[in-house]
């Protein structure tokens, strides 16, 4: 017992010194690049500033988070380890035995296959030296004192070799995917509100400067891949809604939907959006040939790329999505779900969307969550107000344009909320992070509503005149 307490008393991040020089060099390179840009008198755009801050914070998170201390990183890497060692996907058993992948063995395999290819040259045979679980950890208890660490860390281990370096490499891979997601959020917001560039800036900031988004991106997680794939898919859907059917665009939509279906089950909530966009464009343009390419492409690509995994689930678990299997392994709720349960668990749910670190047991200041709650409520009120305005002036082409695009994102967010509510009825493990695969729909909606409400507040405080232009 005394030896265990001694091990737990060791610093949780002894290996930071080993990568400090590498990170210092990266920061110096960024600083020199920034000075070079200024010396050439090339100002950075708002999006570029957000990306720069995201990268700086992302490197900091990468260094500050000990190996396997990021949320579920231990089991995501366990899936990768199993795939590398056996060359096959995990088969979930209900015999009570612990596995290296836990409930995440039920996840779709695309992210883990890419990660296995990325880390193939690396030797991870020392993985067991990193995977020393803290038996006294107080996970998912942000108000608990002490025992925050999931792992007992060994000061002699290096992050620059073996499994430690594989984790570092995958974290940097996740950061790159996160940067792509921020760009896509910005582009999607430009589609939704082309006359208000402020919306795109706010949406990108709500994504790239969200501490939890940075934390998840700078960890080993399949959320990073799902976020960028879903963002690209939503952008192409909005483009199809605006421009009509284009063969290349339709085929890319079909391919992206197939890929994202095999990266995260959450992505399937985009299927109604695909069907709705195709139907609306067909009704508006009467382009039957384009519609055939669009709908047949979706079916063919999905059957070729993703169908096998869902059929495998049916054969193994008698369910296509694997959700019941995952919930049973994660820990079934074991009681009747009610609104009382929903409200009691919502506090941690909303905290874990904006920032709840480690094993969901390291929280930020209460004022931070309060301010973001106010912002979220303001955004929802602004969305309702904007929709009422657009419906009132729906005779104008621009109003119909903005209403169509906003409605597509709102429908996606609504269906995602229904899916999260269903998942919450199955297991206790429902945190705000599970919304991230569709953050490319959530952030633009929040930004549109927030900017709309702030604009009307400013408008009411400032006397209108001919020079006043809507931001």
Q: Model-flagged regions — what are they?
A:
Residues 82-172, 330-333, 361-365:
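Interfacial juxtamembrane loops and adjacent helix segments
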Residues 54, 203-208, 235, 257-261:
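Short helix- or helix-capping micro-motifs
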Residues 48, 137-157, 161, 185-209:
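Transmembrane-helix signature of polytopic, membrane-embedded enzymes
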